[in-house]
Amino acid sequence: MLHHHCRRNPELQEELQIQAAVAAGDVHTVRKMLEQGYSPNGRDANGWTLLHFSAARGKERCVRVFLEHGADPTVKDLIGGFTALHYAAMHGRARIARLMLESEYRSDIINAKSNDGWTPLHVAAHYGRDSFVRLLLEFKAEVDPLSDKGTTPLQLAIIRERSSCVKILLDHNANIDIQNGFLLRYAVIKSNHSYCRMFLQRGADTNLGRLEDGQTPLHLSALRDDVLCARMLYNYGADTNTRNYEGQTPLAVSISISGSSRPCLDFLQDVTRQPRTLQDLCRIKIRQCIGLQNLKLLDELPIAKVMKDYLKHKFDDI
């Protein structure tokens, strides 16, 4: 029955033949069929072109041949509105992506959005494809594109704990304070001290509160009784007098959840009673004046190494 159906549908037969050739990496057959007039831009039931198929399968030589014969990498599928570059990002096919990005379509595909507003950079960050993230940024992909839910690639990398991608994106000046300080608050909520330290060292604002309740990272540290996070936040300039929308300071929050002595409560009581030293105030102000984008250039300042280390918080006991 299938044989009879295929005989009556030569187009379907050709489609299956060229897909089988791609799956097998049979470039000779692929090239021959294209030269005989087979279109590289035909679409299957899912809206996939042969470029989608070969990019997802990692068939680099087939991708090259399809591009040489007029394949259009801007075509989006019917599954989620993904281009072939999205699928290359999903599977970490950096060499295939480079072929597409070096084509005349680069500006049309590098920031192309799926139905949910995901760019290839969102996909690469989500799946932890660090070499792919580097490649997209090398070709000047937008570093902070927003999905339909307002999410950036950096946020996805944080949530999925893709540490390498996080560092790469931050090195390319991704907005560390996106969504009013989401990243630092997320690190605090998850008690991820390494992320917390990384964001603080890179200049994350310690005093941005959630839009829904005004809770700052220090309030959240108090809620979690996380004295290590609280100490880091304080050292990097968190204001112990900032109030949430209920009028509570971090100390008041800590007291409200504990009737007895707790590490974070004890720490907040100590730092709230006494003012910061002039030395610490100067460090906080100098880091603010240097600015987010220039903190990584501290080593180039014409000052003593001990001062550079101090500005980097290398002497903090945390």
Swiss-Prot record:
InterPro entries: Ankyrin_rpt, Ankyrin_rpt-contain_sf, ASB7_SOCS, SOCS_box, SOCS_box-like_dom_sf
Subcellular location: Nucleus; Cytoplasm
Any one annotated GO CC term: nucleus
ANK repeat extents: 13-42, 46-75, 80-109, 116-145, 149-178, 180-208, 213-242
Ranges for domain SOCS box: 265-318
Membrane spanning residue stretches: none
Pfam families with a match to the protein in the record: Ank_2, SOCS_box
CDD domains on file: SOCS_ASB7 (cd03726)
SMART domains registered for this protein in UniProt: ANK, SOCS, SOCS_box
The entry's keywords: ANK repeat, Cytoplasm, Nucleus, Repeat, Ubl conjugation pathway
Source domain of life: Eukaryota
PROSITE patterns membership: ANK_REP_REGION, ANK_REPEAT, SOCS
Gene knockout outcome: Asb7 knockdown disturbs the meiotic progression and cytokinesis during mouse oocyte maturation.
Subunit structure, interactors included: Interacts with CUL5. Interacts with RNF7. Interacts with PSRC1.
Domain characteristics, as noted in the entry: The SOCS box domain mediates the interaction with the Elongin BC complex, an adapter module in different E3 ubiquitin-protein ligase complexes.
Known role: Probable substrate-recognition component of a SCF-like ECS (Elongin-Cullin-SOCS-box protein) E3 ubiquitin-protein ligase complex which mediates the ubiquitination and subsequent proteasomal degradation of target proteins. Plays a role in spindle dynamics and genome integrity by targeting the mitotic progression protein PSRC1 for proteasomal degradation in a cell cycle-dependent manner. Also participates in meiosis by mediating the proper attachment between kinetochores and microtubules.
Protein name, as recorded: Ankyrin repeat and SOCS box protein 7
Lineage: Eukaryota, Metazoa, Chordata, Craniata, Vertebrata
